[in-house]
Regions:
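Conserved anion/nucleotide-ligand pocket segment
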Residues: 116-137
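Aromatic pocket-lining residues of Rossmann-like dinucleotide-binding sites
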Residues: 19
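Beta-loop-alpha module in the N-terminal Rossmann-like domain of NAD(P)-dependent dehydrogenases
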Residues: 55-71, 87
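Conserved N-terminal Rossmann-fold NAD(P)-binding element of oxidoreductases
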Residues: 3-7
């Protein structure tokens, strides 16, 4: 599976590293040079060609994150949006792409993992999600 990670900052570098460590074919796009095990592209996430990606993980700053999704929403892509945006998901009606909108690490991704565990293992009596700190430490 070919995954394009857009943005290699605090969250982006963490997510990219975890995906590489899990054995995925990961390409990291950023406008700042980054040290990474992924195949690195010094390029704008907005202007790069992502047509060969199976999944796009949008982790650019929220101030431009909505622009990335808006440009890709009609290209038949599968997009996971981890950038915080003040835009609402109603703009994703009648589009050609699948968008998991404003997922975030926690509570977004963590809640999806709890739901997956519940489906796999049955009723969960208790779930604790601890949030905070630097994910790279």
């Amino acid at each position: 599976m070919r995954i394009h990670c857009l943005g290699g900052g605090l969250v982006g570098s963490f997510v990219t590293r975890k995906l590489v460590d899990a054995g995925f074919n990961v390409h990291l796009y950023d406008i700042v040079e980054r040290e990474t095990k992924a195949e690195f592209h010094l390029a704008s996430a907005l202007d790069s060609d992502h047509s060969d990606a199976d999944i796009i993980v949008n982790m650019v700053p929220g101030s431009i994150g909505h622009e990335v999704v808006d440009r890709m929403k009609n290209k038949g892509q599968r997009i996971i949006d981890l950038s915080f945006s003040e835009q609402t998901p109603d703009r994703f009606e009648n589009i050609d792409s699948a968008v998991l909108w404003d997922v975030g690490i926690a509570p977004g991704l963590s809640n999806m993992l709890v739901a997956l565990a519940s489906r796999k293992y049955g009723k969960l009596d208790k779930v604790t999600i601890k949030v905070g700190g630097n994910p790279s430490q």
